[in-house]
Amino acid sequence: MGGFDYLQKGGTGFTLQVKKPQIRRVVQTRPAAPSPSANKATPRTVPSGPQKKTPETASRSVTGERGFSPSKRRLTPLRNRKRPTPEQRLSSDDDDDGSDTDTSLELRKRARTGESAEPDYGRRLRSLKAFSGDETRSLPIVHASEITSVQKPGKFKPAFENMNQTSEIFLQYPSATPKERYEAVVPRDDDEFKPLDDIVQVIETVTQAYIPEDELDEFNNESTGIKRRLRRALARGSEREFRESVKDYNVAIERLRRSGSIAKKLDATYRLSLPHVERILTQIYSRTVSPRVDSLRQYENGTDNVYGELLPRFISTIFKETGLKSNHVFVDLGSGVGNVVLQAALEIGCESWGCEMMQNACDLAELQQAEFKARCRLWGIAPGKTHLVRGDFLKEQSIIDVLKRADVVLINNQAFTPQLNNELINHFLDMKEGCQIVSLKSFVPVGHKIQSRNLNSPINLLTVKQRQYWSNSVSWTDVGGSYFIATKDSSRLKAFSESLA
């Protein structure tokens, strides 16, 4: 199952016949809380799902089940290391079986659910072209109906009894672009894409992020609001009521867009909420990576690479901790299928780079990048520029060059060999002052001091802060741990050198 597939499996799935929330519990065997040294091996299978709780307005499924946050992070491959059987974590924080040690329970309790990045008043969120009125041609997006009728035929069934001959439903997004095409079907297997649920979540997100306050009653009214009518239609299994609700939503969005209300709301917005970011990234992933996720499994099964993923809320926290802004440059070394690169470009609006050497992952990253550009236009968002590079990040000249002007560099080095870490350190010499390097293992040994005998070591240029990540931040464990933010700062080395003189 792919990284964003969990959102479809647990977080946003629904059954039309069920009229009350379902409680799902998946029991798994948990290892004892790892010691600091045990954190060195963090095996991971192909991209798997996020598990963060998000605000109800954006991520509550139509059956009341908890949503999982999308987006993920892949650990850059480690050579010659065996990979234990991976686990799929479907339980939420509430499903704690109490088998962890006191330490892990404490870390689990302290899970954070903060906002996304700080407001960036220098960023223009709205895509001017998306609201120009010239978007008469269809965007090159992968329509939801292509998943259900082309990519995975036979895996879906009619969503309603006695359906009309056509199963198509068209959904308007906040921009001037044409509608997205859906089919009124549900998956035979609960793991698969759920188009009706995607419709509901899009409407939730649009209501939260694009609708002016004085217009919200049409969407949020507990009796007659569009969102309430959608859920009532699903609970009753009424195709007619569902289609009417979507039609009324489309009309309302068109009216608000033409009046300029949506553009005005976006122009007064200076950050995207994390649920908003997650919804867009989940759509991209489900239309590009999920149908081809077996290619990642095949590649992994033939190698000794170890995978691990940093989940989207953790990534958002990193953006806040480093003060990443839209005028900055972000680089992800070992970018996998490109999720973090896309998240930085979308959530922050910055220039975002990634480098990956695994060919199957690179192929999927390029599919995601193409869908990302089109789908951001669909949502009316202007993202930062994205650059995905194939190859070894130690050798690719474009990466070597961009590292010299990078503001934030992410290196998921949890399972890197000492040799690879040492080779990376040499690249820090060329980074600019103030560049921040985020890693799961510190490049500076504990207790390191600048001395005459190590005066030429590149790590003398780094000032390191240790931070805690909380439960459901990484893919390989529910337990929290540490990460490090190293800032290039030559002042200490300069002061020491002057003291010798």
Swiss-Prot record:
Class of enzymatic activity (EC top level): transferase
Binding of S-adenosyl-L-methionine, residues: 307-310, 330-339, 356, 392-393
GO terms for MF: histone binding; histone H3K79 methyltransferase activity; histone H3K79 trimethyltransferase activity
Annotated ranges, domain DOT1: 180-501
GO biological process, any: DNA repair
Highest rank taxon of the organism: Eukaryota
EC nos: 2.1.1.360
Family matches, as Gene3D superfamilies: 1.10.260.170, Vaccinia Virus protein VP39
Protein name from the UniProt record: Histone-lysine N-methyltransferase, H3 lysine-79 specific
